[in-house]
Protein backbone atom coordinates (compact mmCIF):
# COMPACT_ATOMS: atom_id res chain seq x y z
CA UNK A 1 0.00 0.00 0.00
CA UNK A 2 2.68 2.49 1.06
CA UNK A 3 4.74 1.72 -2.03
CA UNK A 4 1.78 2.24 -4.37
CA UNK A 5 0.95 5.57 -2.74
CA UNK A 6 4.59 6.65 -2.98
CA UNK A 7 4.33 6.02 -6.73
CA UNK A 8 1.17 8.15 -6.82
CA UNK A 9 2.97 10.88 -4.87
CA UNK A 10 5.92 10.79 -7.29
CA UNK A 11 3.55 10.97 -10.23
CA UNK A 12 1.67 13.88 -8.68
CA UNK A 13 4.99 15.71 -8.26
CA UNK A 14 5.87 15.09 -11.92
CA UNK A 15 2.48 16.38 -13.02
CA UNK A 16 2.81 19.39 -10.73
CA UNK A 17 6.15 20.28 -12.36
CA UNK A 18 4.51 19.95 -15.78
CA UNK A 19 1.66 22.24 -14.73
CA UNK A 20 4.19 24.77 -13.47
CA UNK A 21 5.95 24.61 -16.84
CA UNK A 22 2.64 25.09 -18.69
CA UNK A 23 1.97 28.15 -16.53
CA UNK A 24 5.41 29.61 -17.31
CA UNK A 25 4.99 29.07 -21.04
CA UNK A 26 1.55 30.64 -21.10
CA UNK A 27 2.72 33.62 -19.02
CA UNK A 28 5.74 34.22 -21.26
CA UNK A 29 3.56 34.00 -24.36
CA UNK A 30 1.11 36.54 -22.90
CA UNK A 31 3.93 38.86 -21.78
CA UNK A 32 5.56 38.59 -25.20
CA UNK A 33 2.34 39.29 -27.08
CA UNK A 34 1.66 42.30 -24.84
CA UNK A 35 5.21 43.54 -25.38
CA UNK A 36 4.91 43.26 -29.15
CA UNK A 37 1.53 44.99 -29.09
CA UNK A 38 3.01 47.79 -26.97
CA UNK A 39 5.61 48.44 -29.69
CA UNK A 40 3.29 47.83 -32.64
CA UNK A 41 3.92 51.18 -34.31
CA UNK A 42 7.41 51.74 -32.93
CA UNK A 43 9.20 48.38 -33.17
CA UNK A 44 12.51 50.25 -33.66
CA UNK A 45 12.19 51.41 -30.01
CA UNK A 46 11.75 47.88 -28.65
CA UNK A 47 14.69 46.41 -26.77
CA UNK A 48 16.71 43.92 -28.84
CA UNK A 49 17.06 41.68 -25.79
CA UNK A 50 13.29 41.66 -25.26
CA UNK A 51 12.63 40.95 -28.93
CA UNK A 52 15.11 38.07 -28.84
CA UNK A 53 13.48 36.76 -25.66
CA UNK A 54 9.82 37.15 -26.65
CA UNK A 55 9.95 37.23 -30.43
CA UNK A 56 9.99 33.51 -31.09
CA UNK A 57 7.32 32.41 -28.61
CA UNK A 58 4.30 33.20 -30.79
CA UNK A 59 5.63 30.82 -33.45
CA UNK A 60 6.53 27.96 -31.13
CA UNK A 61 4.28 25.40 -29.55
CA UNK A 62 4.77 22.80 -26.89
CA UNK A 63 2.45 20.00 -25.93
CA UNK A 64 2.24 18.30 -22.57
CA UNK A 65 0.68 15.01 -21.60
CA UNK A 66 -0.43 14.10 -18.09
CA UNK A 67 1.31 11.13 -16.47
CA UNK A 68 -1.30 8.76 -15.05
CA UNK A 69 0.40 5.35 -14.85
CA UNK A 70 0.28 5.16 -11.04
CA UNK A 71 -3.39 6.12 -11.02
CA UNK A 72 -4.12 3.47 -13.64
CA UNK A 73 -2.30 0.94 -11.46
CA UNK A 74 -4.41 1.96 -8.45
CA UNK A 75 -7.59 1.52 -10.47
CA UNK A 76 -6.55 -1.82 -11.96
CA UNK A 77 -5.45 -3.31 -8.64
CA UNK A 78 -7.32 -3.48 -5.38
CA UNK A 79 -5.11 -0.83 -3.80
CA UNK A 80 -7.68 1.95 -4.17
CA UNK A 81 -10.34 -0.07 -2.32
CA UNK A 82 -7.84 -0.90 0.41
CA UNK A 83 -7.04 2.71 1.28
CA UNK A 84 -8.47 2.95 4.79
CA UNK A 85 -9.06 6.68 4.74
CA UNK A 86 -11.70 7.13 2.05
CA UNK A 87 -11.16 10.90 2.10
CA UNK A 88 -7.63 10.24 0.85
CA UNK A 89 -8.93 7.98 -1.92
CA UNK A 90 -11.36 10.70 -3.01
CA UNK A 91 -8.64 13.35 -2.83
CA UNK A 92 -6.33 11.27 -5.03
CA UNK A 93 -9.09 10.88 -7.62
CA UNK A 94 -9.77 14.62 -7.46
CA UNK A 95 -6.06 15.41 -7.85
CA UNK A 96 -5.99 13.48 -11.11
CA UNK A 97 -9.13 15.31 -12.24
CA UNK A 98 -7.30 18.58 -11.47
CA UNK A 99 -4.34 17.40 -13.55
CA UNK A 100 -6.68 16.65 -16.44
CA UNK A 101 -8.33 20.07 -16.07
CA UNK A 102 -4.93 21.79 -16.06
CA UNK A 103 -4.03 20.07 -19.30
CA UNK A 104 -7.38 21.02 -20.84
CA UNK A 105 -6.85 24.62 -19.69
CA UNK A 106 -3.42 24.73 -21.34
CA UNK A 107 -4.76 23.01 -24.43
CA UNK A 108 -7.41 25.74 -24.74
CA UNK A 109 -4.67 28.36 -24.72
CA UNK A 110 -2.49 26.37 -27.08
CA UNK A 111 -5.24 25.75 -29.65
CA UNK A 112 -6.42 29.37 -29.61
CA UNK A 113 -2.84 30.54 -30.12
CA UNK A 114 -2.19 27.99 -32.85
CA UNK A 115 -5.35 28.94 -34.76
CA UNK A 116 -4.59 32.66 -34.58
CA UNK A 117 -0.93 32.26 -35.54
CA UNK A 118 -1.82 29.90 -38.39
CA UNK A 119 -4.05 32.61 -39.91
CA UNK A 120 -1.05 34.94 -39.83
CA UNK A 121 1.67 32.61 -41.11
CA UNK A 122 -0.53 31.32 -43.92
CA UNK A 123 -0.66 34.82 -45.43
CA UNK A 124 1.36 35.06 -48.62
CA UNK A 125 2.96 38.32 -47.42
CA UNK A 126 4.15 36.64 -44.23
CA UNK A 127 5.57 33.64 -46.07
CA UNK A 128 7.37 35.97 -48.47
CA UNK A 129 9.03 38.12 -45.79
CA UNK A 130 9.91 35.15 -43.57
CA UNK A 131 11.84 33.62 -46.49
CA UNK A 132 13.82 36.81 -47.05
CA UNK A 133 17.00 37.57 -45.18
CA UNK A 134 15.34 39.85 -42.61
CA UNK A 135 16.17 40.49 -38.97
CA UNK A 136 13.84 39.30 -36.23
CA UNK A 137 12.90 42.94 -35.57
CA UNK A 138 11.91 43.44 -39.23
CA UNK A 139 9.89 40.23 -39.32
CA UNK A 140 8.08 41.09 -36.09
CA UNK A 141 7.42 44.65 -37.23
CA UNK A 142 5.93 43.36 -40.46
CA UNK A 143 3.98 40.61 -38.68
CA UNK A 144 2.35 42.88 -36.10
CA UNK A 145 1.25 45.26 -38.86
CA UNK A 146 -0.54 42.47 -40.73
CA UNK A 147 -4.18 42.39 -39.55
CA UNK A 148 -3.79 38.64 -38.92
CA UNK A 149 -0.53 39.19 -37.01
CA UNK A 150 -2.08 41.89 -34.85
CA UNK A 151 -5.12 39.64 -34.24
CA UNK A 152 -2.83 36.73 -33.29
CA UNK A 153 -0.95 38.82 -30.71
CA UNK A 154 -4.22 40.10 -29.24
CA UNK A 155 -5.59 36.55 -29.10
CA UNK A 156 -2.48 35.30 -27.28
CA UNK A 157 -2.64 38.20 -24.84
CA UNK A 158 -6.34 37.65 -24.06
CA UNK A 159 -6.84 33.85 -24.09
CA UNK A 160 -6.80 33.48 -20.31
CA UNK A 161 -7.22 36.45 -18.03
CA UNK A 162 -4.89 35.28 -15.25
CA UNK A 163 -3.20 31.95 -15.98
CA UNK A 164 -1.03 32.27 -12.85
CA UNK A 165 -4.11 32.27 -10.64
CA UNK A 166 -5.64 29.22 -12.31
CA UNK A 167 -2.47 27.12 -12.52
CA UNK A 168 -1.51 28.07 -8.94
CA UNK A 169 -4.89 26.83 -7.78
CA UNK A 170 -4.31 23.51 -9.57
CA UNK A 171 -0.84 23.17 -8.02
CA UNK A 172 -2.19 23.98 -4.55
CA UNK A 173 -4.76 21.18 -4.82
CA UNK A 174 -2.05 18.73 -5.89
CA UNK A 175 0.18 19.89 -3.00
CA UNK A 176 -2.67 19.26 -0.56
CA UNK A 177 -3.05 15.70 -1.86
CA UNK A 178 0.69 15.08 -1.53
CA UNK A 179 0.59 16.39 2.04
CA UNK A 180 -2.39 14.12 2.78
CA UNK A 181 -0.50 11.07 1.43
CA UNK A 182 2.55 11.99 3.55
CA UNK A 183 0.40 12.43 6.65
CA UNK A 184 -1.31 9.07 6.22
CA UNK A 185 1.61 6.94 5.06
CA UNK A 186 4.84 8.40 6.46
PLM features: residue spans?
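Long, hydrophobic alpha-helical segments that serve as membrane-spanning/inserting helices
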Residues: 1-186
Amino acid sequence: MTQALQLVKSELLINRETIEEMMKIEKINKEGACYLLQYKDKMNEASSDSLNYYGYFPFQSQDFLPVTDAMEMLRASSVMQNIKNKELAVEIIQAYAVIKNAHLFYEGFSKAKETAVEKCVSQQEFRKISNENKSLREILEFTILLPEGFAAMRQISFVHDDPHLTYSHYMKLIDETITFIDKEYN
